[in-house]
Each structure stands twice: as C-alpha cells, then as structure tokens.
C-alpha cells in the first residue's frame, strides 16, 4: 500500500513543481471553500473520534487538540486563504553571479518533492500541512494519530475532491488511514519516494524517527518552555505576560511550563504570583526554596519533582523555581529545555543581550510571551512544524522551509577551461 502511495506522490510532485503561483493559489482557494461547504461531514467524523477518545480516557489536553467545532474549522479554512496571500518562494533567485569563466550561475528555490508528516491528535495539521505543501509545489503523505483517523480521512477526501475539480492530481495529498502502527515503520523507510520526514509528536515518536528513518528527519514541537523573571522587572508588567504564556492555550507546545524567578524578588513577587494564578486555576509545582513564599497564597502549591522539569504539562500546571541569578537560570534552561522557546523578563539591557546570546533555543524572547512562536504570528502563514534542530530549518517552518535550491548555470556553448 505505502509503495503505491509513494509512487503516486512522487508522480504528483513532478506535476506540482511546474505549476504557476496563480494555479496553486486557485487550488488553495477551492480547498478553503470546499472545507466550509463540506464542514458537516468533517465535524461528524470528528464527533466520532471525540466520542471514542473519551471512552478510551484521553486526557483533557489531548482532547482539546483533537476537537473541531464550526469556529475552529472556519479558522482552518481562513488559514488556507492566508497561505494564498503569501509570496510563493518557488522560483525565487537566492543569489547569482557571472564567473570569470563566462558561466552565469544562480541559486533558485525549488520544491523538496514529497514530504511525509507524522502527527498525533491535531486535525488542523492535516489542512495546514497540505496547504503549505501545495503552495510550495510539494506532494505530501500524512499519517495522523489513531485518535483522529476518521477526521483526517474526511478532511483529506474533501481536499482530494477539490484538487480533482481543479484538474490536479488527487494523490498530491494522501493520508495513511489505517491506524496500524506498523505502517509508521514502513513510512520511515520510504526514502525512494519521500524526500523529508517531519514527526510532530512526543519524545518517543521523535526517537523512533531518528533511529529508524532512512529519510532525512526534521524534529520539533516538544516545548518545555521557560520564562526567567530577573530582579529588575516591574511586577505589573510581568504577570500579564506570564498569564498569556501559560493560559492562552495550555495544550500548545509554545506554552510556558517552568517559571524561573530571581531569589531577590521572591518575597514580594511570589505571593502576587499565587493570587494571580489562583484566579486562573493554575496549580503551582514549586521547589523547596520557592514553596515557603507560596504556602500561604491561595493557589494550590505542591512540591515539584525532577521529572516535572523535563516534561510538558500541556495543562494548567506551572513549575516555579528560584534562581541565584542569571547564570543559574541559563544553566537550568540548557539542562532541561528542548530548544523550543524561552524568554527573559527584564529591564536590564545587559541581561537581555546576554540571554539572547547565551540561550541556544530556536526562538528567544525579551519581554514577550513564548506564545508568539507560531507561523501565523511570525508572518509565515500556517506552519508545518516548529523545528528545534539546526538543519535544515529552525523555529516555525513556513513556506521557505519546504523548499530547497538548485544551482543553475547559463553559458553560450561554454566549455570548462
């Protein structure tokens, strides 16, 4: 089955690679309209997935990721239209020069070819990735989690019909509908047809892909994100940023998981933090040094464990740890962080500059929420993933991250000297 999917995707990628920007944008517009016109079939499939997920005891954070409703589906269609408005990077000349030999040489952006994406209970990823791949002339093979297989199947059916209506190959977007995990291993070895693989899931999935894949892999999306509050910050300015980072969408990979606080402000700041987090229903997981300042506050406070520092909460839980100073905060982030998104809240220019230089994360913020790590917020449109590695892309992966380049040389019957 996967062999045939791979062959079909590769053939489709050759057709997509030569489409004009106008042709691709027209197809994306039809896809967006079709998603809205066929929303009920997608929502019905999602309702079945949600019911089964609840029966299987899926945790609230994952249920939130799985859920589609009319508003979320409309937002997904709007994201596709936003991709239409983005500049098509395919065909752009990155740089060029005329050499002494007389050869005119340039680097030009081209599609990758076929992209494979493995993800979990995120039905929006199906559309986001399909739109970005089509915009950049790539075919895509999707393998969503077993929790979303009905939703994904219904969504891909709508997309494929839209492609057919536009005279484009339906197999440009394919989904592995069988939830059998053995098919993941088979996909990892489909290097004859798939040019890049992106796993969007937990540490176990990333480890499996790194160890077993014969396809180049880009990993990311695991976000143990930190905010360090230093001793110069204005409390009234800091608390709303912390709230936004933790509460806006706790199940997101760019939400705050660990708050590091300079010990010099603990006595004044932590009681206020407790009151603020209590109103938001946040449970604080504090170290031995921080707990005495939180014990009398209204927010639920428990002892943090070593494992807590390594894991994503993806819920209304927040680790709180006191720091001796800047160096200890950076050391903590280096040890426990996942190189996703980390921030400092400070009024010190020197501290801000050091944090930017010394914290080796994909995205580093000064006086801003970690929630900004998002393709839409960065002006990239929808994102295919947030890469936490350094090759071939880093941070939110928009259109350019789904391209490579080729060297093109022009001569006049030129021979090498």
Swiss-Prot record:
Keyword Lipoprotein: no
Pfam families found in the cross-reference section: Aldedh (PF00171)
Keywords, in A-Z order: Amino-acid biosynthesis, Cytoplasm, NADP, Oxidoreductase, Proline biosynthesis
InterPro entries: Ald_DH/histidinol_DH, Ald_DH_C, Ald_DH_N, Aldehyde_DH_dom, Glu-5-SA_DH, GPR_dom
Purpose: Catalyzes the NADPH-dependent reduction of L-glutamate 5-phosphate into L-glutamate 5-semialdehyde and phosphate. The product spontaneously undergoes cyclization to form 1-pyrroline-5-carboxylate.
PANTHER family membership: DELTA-1-PYRROLINE-5-CARBOXYLATE SYNTHASE (PTHR11063:SF8), GLUTAMATE SEMIALDEHYDE DEHYDROGENASE (PTHR11063)
NCBIfam families named in the record: PRK00197.1 (NF001221), proA (TIGR00407)
Protein name as it appears in the record: Gamma-glutamyl phosphate reductase
Record gene name: proA
């Amino acid at each position: 089955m996967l062999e045939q999917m791979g062959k079909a995707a590769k053939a489709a990628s050759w057709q997509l690679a030569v489409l004009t920007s106008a042709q691709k944008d027209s197809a994306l517009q039809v896809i967006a309209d079709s998603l809205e016109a066929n929303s009920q079939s997608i929502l019905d499939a999602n309702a079945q997935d949600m019911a089964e997920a609840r029966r299987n005891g899926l945790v609230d954070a994952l249920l939130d990721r799985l859920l589609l409703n009319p508003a979320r589906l409309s937002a997904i269609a709007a994201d596709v239209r936003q991709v239409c408005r983005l500049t098509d990077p395919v065909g752009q000349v990155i740089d060029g020069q005329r050499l002494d030999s007389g050869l005119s040489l340039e680097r030009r952006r081209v599609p990758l070819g076929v992209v494979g994406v493995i993800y979990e209970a995120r039905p929006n990823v199906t559309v986001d990735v399909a739109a970005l791949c089509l915009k950049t002339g790539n075919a895509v093979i999707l393998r969503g989690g077993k929790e979303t297989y009905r939703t994904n199947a219904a969504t891909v059916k709508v997309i494929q019909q839209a492609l057919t209506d536009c005279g484009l190959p339906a197999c440009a977007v394919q989904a592995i509908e069988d939830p059998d995990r053995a098919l993941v291993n088979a996909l990892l070895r489909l290097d004859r047809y798939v040019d890049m693989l992106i796993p969007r899931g937990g540490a176990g999935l990333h480890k499996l892909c790194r160890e077993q894949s014969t396809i180049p892999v880009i990993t990311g999306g695991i976000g143990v994100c930190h905010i360090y509050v230093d001793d110069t910050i204005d409390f009234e300015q800091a608390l709303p940023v912390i709230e936004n980072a933790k509460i806006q969408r706790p199940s997101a990979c760019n939400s705050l998981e660990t708050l590091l606080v300079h010990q010099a402000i603990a006595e004044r700041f932590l009681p206020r933090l407790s009151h603020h987090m209590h109103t938001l229903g946040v449970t604080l997981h504090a170290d031995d040094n921080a707990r005495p300042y939180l014990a009398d506050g209204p927010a639920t406070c428990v002892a943090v464990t070593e494992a807590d520092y390594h894991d994503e909460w993806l819920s209304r839980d927040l680790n709180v740890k006191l720091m001796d100073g800047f160096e200890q905060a950076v050391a903590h982030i280096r040890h426990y962080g996942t190189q996703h998104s980390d921030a400092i809240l400070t009024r010190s220019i020197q501290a801000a500059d050091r944090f930017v230089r010394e914290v080796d994360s994909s995205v580093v913020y000064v006086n801003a929420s970690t929630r900004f790590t998002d393709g839409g917020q960065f002006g990239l449109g929808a994102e295919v993933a947030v890469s936490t590695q350094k090759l071939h892309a880093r941070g939110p992966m928009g259109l350019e991250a789904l391209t490579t380049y080729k060297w093109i040389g022009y001569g006049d019957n030129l021979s090498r000297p």
